[in-house]
Amino acid sequence: HNKVNKKYLKGIMLNVGLDPEKRKAVKKYSIGMKQRLGIAQAIMENQEIIILDEPMNGLDIDGIQQVKKLLVELKEQGRTILLVSHNYEDIEELCDVIYEMSMGKIQQKNKILFWRNNYCKSIITCFSNRKNIFI
């Protein structure tokens, strides 16, 4: 493992909304704080590809905004982020390319604009073909 300098580590912790000066056992962290710590761990080694599985789960609104801002900054720095999400808003906001999976296999790959146009059409078609919809 590469040595990570303390200033860099503090910056990452601040970017994900954790106080680097606070000394607290991780087992006492809330779910959201553990999620933020996991994101910090994923990005701290400055790898070319960052893999994040549902990174917004367990975060409050401020935490979600902080993480989204950080991911956009990392993307602008040229880092590749593999984001697993079921949240269409996150996908639309953060992704350039979409890989749709089913049964553990990639079914199709699309650019976000193509996906957005076709996804919206398929939702409308799906609901317009139903006789009874209960909400």
Annotated model-derived regions:
Residues 50-53:
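Catalytic Walker B motif of ABC-type/P-loop ATPase nucleotide-binding domains
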Residues 61-62:
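Helix N-cap at the start of a conserved alpha-helix in ABC-type nucleotide-binding domains
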Residues 65-77:
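Helical segment within the ABC ATPase nucleotide-binding domain
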Residues 4-21:
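Conserved ABC ATPase "signature" region
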Residues 85-86:
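H-loop/switch region of ABC-family ATPase nucleotide-binding domains
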Residues 91-93:
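A short, surface-exposed alpha-helical micro-motif characterized by mixed small hydrophobic
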